[in-house]
C-alpha cells in the first residue's frame, strides 16, 4: 500500500491528515489519553514535548555559513513577513474579540489566528519553488526562514502590538531548543545530518497530538473563514514580500511570491501561545483549525501564483 504517497498528494498532508485523525479521536473518545495512559497518552497529549524535539532538530539544520547575498535575500523576506504580521495585529486588535468572532463567515477569526498564519513561511514549499523558478541563492534564502519555526516570533509580535505580555524566561524557553540544535548542528556536520532526518519524521506525530486538542465541530464551524484566511495570507503578505524581494533583496519578485505561504508548523502556534498567555485560550481551538485551512489554501495558491509570475517575467525578458 502506498499510504505515504497518497497522504502527500494533499498539500501539507503529513501534518494535516494526522491532525484530522487526532481530531476524530478526540471527538469520538475525548478521554482516550487518560483512559489508556502510559505511552498512548504520550502520543495523544504530547504536543509540547514532541514539538520541543522538532524545534531542536530544526535548529540543527540551520547553517551558520551563508553568503552575504543569501542573508540579504532571506533577511528581507523574513523581516518583511514579520513586519506585515505585526501591522495586521495592530490594525485588527481593536476590531476582533480576543476570543475570536463567534459566528458568520468569519467565525473563529482572531488576532491569534491572523498572526500565526502570517508570520511563518512554508520553507519546504519555498525551497522547492525556488529550485524550479529561482536561483541557488533564492533557494538558499530558506536558511533564515527556519528561525520563524516555533512560537517565538508570534510571541514577539503579540507582545510588540500590546496584546500580550510574556515573562522573559518564556522567551528563553521558547527559543532554547532551537539554539541548542543550532549550536550542535554547526559544531558537527554529521550531527546536523543526523538530526535533520527527524524533522520530517516528527511532523505526523505532533500533528496527531495537536489534533487531539480539537473537535471536528470546530473545524466544520470555521470552514469558510479558514479559506478566506488562506487567501488573505497570500494577498496581504504576498505584495509586500514581492516588493521587498525586488527593492531590498535584489531579486525579481519571484522569491517574494513563493514566500507568501503558511507553514505547517504554524498550526501548533495557537495552542502553544494559549499555554503561555491564558487570555488566548478561548481562541486557540478555532485558530488552530483556521491555520490548518490556511496551510492547505496557501499550499495550493502559492505554487500557481509563483509559476504565473515567473513565466510573466520570462516573457518580458524574452
From Swiss-Prot:
Gene Ontology cellular-component terms for this entry are: plasma membrane
Q: Where are the transmembrane segments?
A: 10-30, 42-62, 82-102, 109-129, 139-159, 163-183, 201-221, 224-244, 257-277, 289-309
Family annotation (Pfam families): KdgT
Q: Which InterPro entries match?
A: 2keto-3dGluconate_permease, 2keto-3dGluconate_permease_sub
State the membrane topology. Multi-pass membrane protein
Q: Which domain of life is it from?
A: Bacteria
List where in the cell it is found. Cell inner membrane
Q: GO MF annotations for this entry?
A: 2-keto-3-deoxygluconate:proton symporter activity
Chief subcellular location:
membrane
- What catalytic reaction does the record list? 2-dehydro-3-deoxy-D-gluconate(in) + H(+)(in) = 2-dehydro-3-deoxy-D-gluconate(out) + H(+)(out)
Which keywords describe this protein according to UniProt? Cell inner membrane, Cell membrane, Membrane, Sugar transport, Symport, Transmembrane, Transmembrane helix, Transport
Q: What does this protein do?
A: Catalyzes the proton-dependent uptake of 2-keto-3-deoxygluconate (KDG) into the cell.
Q: Which NCBIfam families match?
A: kdgT (TIGR00793)
- Tell me the protein family, please: Belongs to the KdgT transporter family.
**The protein's name:** 2-keto-3-deoxygluconate permease
Which species expresses this protein natively? Xanthomonas axonopodis pv. citri (strain 306)
Gene that encodes it = kdgT
